[in-house]
Amino acid sequence: MDKQIGLQIHIRIINFPSTEAALPEGCENLASTTSPQMFNNFFKALTLLQQLLEEILEECRPNCLVADTAFPWATEVAGRFGIPRLIFHGTSYFAICAFLSKFHHEPYKNTVSDSEYFTVPGLPDHIQMTKLQQPSYFKGVDDEQKKLTDLSVQSEVTSYGVLVNSFNELEPAYSEHYRNVFGRKAWKVGPVSLCNKEIEEKSLRGKAASIDTYECLKWLDSKRPNSVLYISFGSKYRFPDAQLLEIAKGLEAAGQDFIWVIKNEDKQELLEEFEQRIAKDKKGLIIKGWAPQVLI
């Protein structure tokens, strides 16, 4: 559609340096990582994209560079070519503001235990969390992620501005807070998921779904509106057996209709009896692997 209205769009495909970063060939996104070491190697692979990007910029000479927050080196590269760099954030203003508040003030360091609540300072709302709920790099157990986080924050400070996957009606207080408190230029470009209109487009966002999309919709349509709980912990988290079983027990005890997305595709036997019971009662749907989240 953009080409039809006269925009000159050209797509350049480059090879992701999986093997150069000690990743299996074809491992090109976080959903394909299965261990903390693979996770760290994935971000090492991202740094190897710098030279490839510089070669493209040398050839194409664009007026601006838009790069995800996971590429902190992109600001320096853009500066080398004399063009502004805009950071793209796939998360909301609220998530960004909460993260930056914790990053700068480190309120979790004042807690006595991992389960003690602390207040995230300076936000428009009173938000409380525990140290257990924090990413590993905030807890000092992941040096590689800490380095990347520090570089990303510094890169955001020195970049020209930020594009955020949000819209004003969703969180006006936090869009203002981000600009006024953190002093960033920011533009709302969301929700970007609306670019996908057809069922097939929605079901294939990110990668192919591991469940038949029509089977999923048929199950959802059999339930009352607003009656189904959706549980997903993101593409990178895989739980130990004990936690998976506790979640399963909690869902079964609640008696709530649910869709549960599990990234542990290898846990078929562990939850086999649970799956049989919920399938018989038609209370739940378990998706192992990638879920058609936008479609759902």
Predicted regions and their residues:
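Nucleotide-sugar-dependent glycosyltransferase catalytic domains
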Residues: M1-V294
